[in-house]
Regions:
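PAPS-dependent sulfotransferase catalytic domain
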Residues: 70-148, 155-157, 165-182
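Loop/turn-to-beta-strand initiation segments
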Residues: 61-65, 88
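PAPS-dependent sulfotransferase catalytic core
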Residues: 1-60
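Short, surface-exposed acidic/glycine-rich loop or hinge patches that mediate macromolecular interfaces
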Residues: 2, 164-165, 186
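Short, conserved catalytic or adaptor-binding loops enriched in Gly and charged residues
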Residues: 56-59, 148-153
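C-terminal accessory extensions appended to soluble enzyme cores
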Residues: 183-190
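A polyampholytic, Gly/Pro-enriched intrinsically disordered region
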Residues: 41-48, 112-115, 183
Length: 190
């Protein structure tokens, strides 16, 4: 597996009462690569009414419903979730050079999710300094916006670093933060 967010999602989904619906607001798909529909709503419907899509997600999910949100996803969703104190926030951070290299590998190999290393495509990514610096600037601005939104709404988030997702204790602390009684006995590697 290449990214911590995929690994985190797998482990959250292993907790009874928790369902992470992947990148539900990715501009190109719903939930996972190639998916164009979720909760009976197609991509165009989700894009036209993200609030309605969130309602459908809550209504059609047993237990806690969640999704992964990245800075390049639908910006309207940011305001919807940040203004909802009932929506728990989990912030996963990573060394930006490692993140950039992982992203470049995904782009250049067209492998965005890797559960089976037999299918691993080996590439040596091209490092583009202006592109890298722009990504850092964009992410810094997004993180500042995120922190400010938490501050002005009096909310807190569960923060973890990329390396923390390999710590069973930290993931069980996250379950506690979410108010879920279940705990992981082992990490899920799939």
């Amino acid at each position: 597996m290449r990214t911590g967010s995929n690994f985190l999602e797998s482990n959250l989904n292993a907790l009874p009462g928790v369902t992470c619906h992947g990148e539900a607001f990715n501009p190109f798909f719903i939930g996972g690569e190639g998916k164009q529909e979720l909760f009976g709503i197609e991509l165009a419907g989700r894009n036209a009414d993200p609030s309605g899509f969130l309602r459908a997600m809550r209504d059609q999910t047993d237990g806690l419903a969640g999704f992964r949100y990245f800075s390049d996803h639908d910006p309207r969703v940011f305001d919807l979730v940040m203004n909802d104190p009932a929506c728990a926030k989990i912030i996963l951070t990573r060394n930006q050079l490692e993140s950039y290299i992982s992203w470049k590998i995904a782009v250049e190999s067209d492998q965005w999710w890797l559960a089976n290393t037999k299918h691993l495509k080996t590439v040596r990514p091209t490092f583009d300094l202006p592109e890298f610096l722009q990504r850092i600037d964009d992410l810094t601005q997004f993180q500042a916006k995120l922190v400010k939104a938490l501050q002005v709404t009096g909310q807190t988030a569960f923060t973890l670093d990329y390396d923390d997702v390999l710590d069973l204790g930290v993931l069980n602390g996250l379950a506690e933060f979410l108010g879920v009684p279940a705990r992981l006995e082992n990490l899920v590697f799939r």
